[in-house]
């Protein structure tokens, strides 16, 4: 009796599997383009250090809405030192940001990297700006 039940169960599983479509491969937005984050090449980083020497400004909590071979866009938070009265004693200024990476180039390491970042802040920054365009490093520091 048990053998007959197991046989029927196995048969029903085989037959039910025949009516299902083959799984479709998931497509990825992996575009083999990176941004240099001080000492690493990264795709879609959640955190991006803009000034590697002192980490005076960091973009964090980044959510990327688009990441293509020519451009990447996202939103996040900027944490920047106001350097008042000095950078050692400064306080962090936190702002919501919109980020756009552009101008892909080939690094000396042979990787495609974004070489430009556009940042729009939700409030005036310690530097006095609300919009900023910066050149990014195109190779990692060793």
Predicted regions and their residues:
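Sec-dependent bacterial lipoprotein signal peptides
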Residues: 1-16
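N-terminal export/targeting and maturation segments
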Residues: 23-52
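Helix-rich interaction surfaces within compact, conserved domain-sized segments
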Residues: 89-142
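Intrinsically disordered, low-complexity regions enriched in small/polar residues
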Residues: 36, 66-69, 116, 123
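Bacterial signal peptide processing site
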Residues: 18-21
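Mature extracytoplasmic domains of secretory-pathway proteins
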Residues: 49-108
């Amino acid at each position: 009796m048990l053998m007959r039940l197991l046989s029927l169960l196995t048969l029903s599983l085989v037959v039910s599997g025949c009516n299902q479509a083959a799984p479709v491969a998931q497509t990825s937005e992996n575009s083999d383009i990176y941004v240099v984050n001080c000492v690493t090449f990264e795709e879609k980083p959640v955190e991006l250090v803009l000034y590697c020497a002192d980490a005076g400004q960091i973009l964090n909590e980044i959510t990327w809405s688009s990441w293509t071979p020519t451009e990447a866009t996202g939103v996040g938070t900027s944490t920047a030192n106001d350097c008042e009265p000095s950078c050692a004693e400064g306080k962090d200024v936190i702002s919501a940001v919109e980020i756009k990476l552009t101008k892909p180039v080939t690094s000396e390491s042979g990787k495609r990297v974004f070489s430009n970042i556009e940042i729009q802040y939700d409030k005036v920054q310690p530097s006095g700006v609300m919009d900023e365009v910066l050149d990014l490093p195109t190779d990692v520091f060793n």
